[in-house]
């Protein structure tokens, strides 16, 4: 688990990122989950842009967290940032 100070640092880093994955009104088909998995494996910290209402976005974020073992770093409007450490690697 990330501490609140670690999340704060990651949120700052995430501000400079562009969304890597866009989740449209079709939701989270397996292909989108695979794309998120791939982006997390490559970059550790990613941004995802959602198209939907607030409740639907919250459900999608929960599903992403469950399926990818990532951690939510922050959410602003329709964009959320996720972080996942690489296997065997620890954050400084």
For the regions a protein language model found, what residue spans apply to each?
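Positively charged, polar, low-complexity stretches
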Residues: 1-92
């Amino acid at each position: 688990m990330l501490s609140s100070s670690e999340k704060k640092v990651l949120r700052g880093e995430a501000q400079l990122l562009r969304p890597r994955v866009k989740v449209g009104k079709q939701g989270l088909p397996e292909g989108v989950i695979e794309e998120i998995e791939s982006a997390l494996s490559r970059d550790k910290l990613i941004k995802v842009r959602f198209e939907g209402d607030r409740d639907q976005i919250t459900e999608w974020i929960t599903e992403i967290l469950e399926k990818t073992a990532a951690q939510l770093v922050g959410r602003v409007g329709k964009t959320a940032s996720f972080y996942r450490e690489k296997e065997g690697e620890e954050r400084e």
